[in-house]
Regions:
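A short acidic/basic microdomain associated with nuclease active sites
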Residues: 102-127
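Acidic, metal/cofactor-coordinating or nucleic-acid-engaging core segments within structured domains
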Residues: 109, 151-152
Length: 152
């Protein structure tokens, strides 16, 4: 599916998004990217967090695939349970945010890592990666309020 980028939401003077007019993503990619929201156990046996999470994607698809419908360039949350609606919203929001980041910066998913929560209860961003000798942190959004509703 091809989702157009809403340029009206980008602050003026930010040229990073100039070359991106749309994001192309398949339904399965929503799960491959959306699974990044999960914590990786400290004692996992695979060599990278990315490989650990990738090994869980098929289970993730089995759990949530029936609640996501793709119609053209629309993604529909088909759940009626508010908890599942929130999970689906987070999966889609995180996946689209990471996909846009991957396309804009020309990086691979395995180069993005989740930022662990700080010891103190302060705010922090979700993910980080290195690009051109700079450390970049980003925030993705899956839910927009405490009251989740269906999205199209």
């Amino acid at each position: 599916m091809k989702i157009p980028v809403d340029k009206s939401r980008i602050p003026s003077g930010v040229s990073l998004f100039d070359k991106i007019t749309s994001v192309e993503i398949e339904k399965e990619d929503l799960f491959k990217l959306g699974i990044s929201k999960h914590e990786v156990p400290a004692e996992h046996v695979l060599e990278t967090d990315y490989l650990y999470l990738l090994s869980k994607v098929s289970a993730y698809i089995q759990l949530y695939s029936d609640f996501i419908t793709v119609n053209g360039n629309q993604i529909v949350n088909c759940s009626t349970d508010d908890r599942v609606m929130k999970d689906v919203s987070e999966i889609v929001g995180i996946a689209l945010g990471l996909k846009l980041t991957i396309d804009c910066f020309g990086i691979r998913q395995e180069n993005i890592s989740k930022i662990p929560p700080p010891a103190s209860k302060q705010k922090y961003l979700d993910y980080k990666f290195a690009h051109k000798r700079k450390n970049i942190e980003l925030e993705t959004k899956g839910t927009t309020s405490k009251y989740i509703s269906k999205f199209i």
